[in-house]
Swiss-Prot record:
<keyword id="KW-0963">Cytoplasm</keyword>
<keyword id="KW-0456">Lyase</keyword>
<dbReference type="InterPro" id="IPR001015">
    <property type="entry name" value="Ferrochelatase"/>
</dbReference>
<dbReference type="InterPro" id="IPR019772">
    <property type="entry name" value="Ferrochelatase_AS"/>
</dbReference>
<keyword id="KW-0408">Iron</keyword>
<dbReference type="InterPro" id="IPR033644">
    <property type="entry name" value="Ferrochelatase_C"/>
</dbReference>
<feature type="binding site">
    <location>
        <position position="275"/>
    </location>
    <ligand>
        <name>Fe cation</name>
    </ligand>
</feature>
<dbReference type="InterPro" id="IPR033659">
    <property type="entry name" value="Ferrochelatase_N"/>
</dbReference>
<dbReference type="GO" id="GO:0005737">
    <property type="term" value="C:cytoplasm"/>
</dbReference>
<keyword id="KW-0479">Metal-binding</keyword>
<comment type="similarity">
    <text>Belongs to the ferrochelatase family.</text>
</comment>
<dbReference type="GO" id="GO:0046872">
    <property type="term" value="F:metal ion binding"/>
</dbReference>
<comment type="function">
    <text>Catalyzes the ferrous insertion into protoporphyrin IX.</text>
</comment>
<dbReference type="Pfam" id="PF00762">
    <property type="entry name" value="Ferrochelatase"/>
</dbReference>
<keyword id="KW-0350">Heme biosynthesis</keyword>
<comment type="pathway">
    <text>Porphyrin-containing compound metabolism; protoheme biosynthesis; protoheme from protoporphyrin-IX: step 1/1.</text>
</comment>
<protein>
    <recommendedName>
        <fullName>Ferrochelatase</fullName>
        <ecNumber>4.98.1.1</ecNumber>
    </recommendedName>
</protein>
Length: 322
């Protein structure tokens, strides 16, 4: 029997090509037009998106991107590229490509590169530790849609998530412990996950449970009393209720409860990006300090840390034999 030619497709959400209103508008238009992300009827949503949201939000969001943009580009893309490079170096016998669900480098090009190299078994690795219909399932949809254009399809191994994987929890633990060594133990350790509308969970998305699974596993490994480790949700958008407790409201309330020193980690983000570097590290830090807090430390995403690359390699190798 002919041996399969293996390939790995790493996928993250995406980013604008530049911190400009025009580039941000293109990116947001693609992102917010995905029915997995916003499931409102297109007849209602698209006029609102194109007529109101994009013209108003694009300049505002562009300024936020400018505040975190790196010399090499968008933080999310920079760190994702580093992850791709590090994983490829671990597995030189297997081609590894990076594609973004929205923006560049795009998924069609990444898949085309892999298939052009003769890949017959494709491992799809969405860089989302906790499954959600709005992220992981959107990757599944996109890959299936792209492959409709090919006559010869590869077999596919899809990594749904890795919320409780021992190597993932170990990497998070190392990050937290490093922060404790640098800054001392805080009054509270906050685990902030990206939120989703409550309605999505009520319709069957198990994302909240997967966030709780990660939090429970991490609590068991951290040298803090369980009651000093909190789980919250950030980045809500729109008017409908999202998962609670909200990160910003929680941080605002903590100083009045005698909590003066917090450290915050975002376990659901595999790479630092606008939501971690600007929303959390800057905006939410100011919220906490303005409310009377005294010390706030943001614990960076796993990015291209060795422990994170160990995890990604183990995930891929586990699925190569499936």
């Amino acid at each position: 029997m002919k041996q399969s030619k293996l390939g790995v497709l790493m996928v993250n959400l995406g980013t604008p090509d530049a911190p400009t209103p025009q580039a941000v508008k293109r990116y947001l238009a693609e992102f917010l037009s995905d029915r997995r992300v916003v499931d409102t009827s297109p007849w209602l949503w698209w006029p609102l998106l194109r007529g109101v949201i994009l013209p108003i939000r694009s300049p505002r969001v562009a300024k936020l991107y400018q505040s975190v943009w790196m010399d090499e580009g968008s933080p999310l893309l920079v760190y994702s590229r580093r992850q791709q490079k590090a994983l490829a170096e671990r597995m030189p016998e297997i081609p590894v490509e990076l594609g973004m669900s929205y923006g560049s480098p795009n998924l069609p090009d990444a898949i085309d590169k892999l298939l052009a190299q003769g890949v017959t078994k494709l491992v799809v690795l969405p860089l989302y530790p906790q499954y959600s219909c709005s992220t992981s399932a959107a990757v599944w949809d996109a890959v299936a849609r792209i492959l409709q254009g090919y006559r010869r399809l590869p077999s596919i191994s899809f990594i749904r998530d890795y919320a409780e994987h021992p190597a993932y929890i170990s990497a998070l633990k190392q990050s937290v412990e490093h922060s404790f060594v640098q800054h001392g133990k805080p009054d509270r350790l906050v685990l902030s996950f990206h939120g989703i509308p409550k309605r999505y969970a009520q319709l069957g998305d198990d994302y909240p449970q997967r966030c709780e699974d990660t939090s429970r596993a991490l609590r068991a490994e951290i040298a803090l009393p369980a009651e000093q480790i909190m789980m919250t949700y950030q980045s809500r958008f729109g008017r409908e209720p999202w998962l609670t407790p909200y990160t910003d409201e929680t941080l605002k309330s903590l100083p009045s409860q005698g909590v003066k020193h917090i450290q915050l980690i975002c376990p659901g983000f595999s790479a630092d990006c606008l939501e971690t570097l600007e929303e959390i590290k800057e905006q939410n830090r100011e919220i906490f300090l303005h409310a009377g807090g005294e010390k706030f430390e943001y614990i960076p995403a796993l990015n291209d840390d060795k422990g994170h690359i160990d995890l990604l390699e183990q995930l891929v190798r586990d699925h190569l034999s499936c």
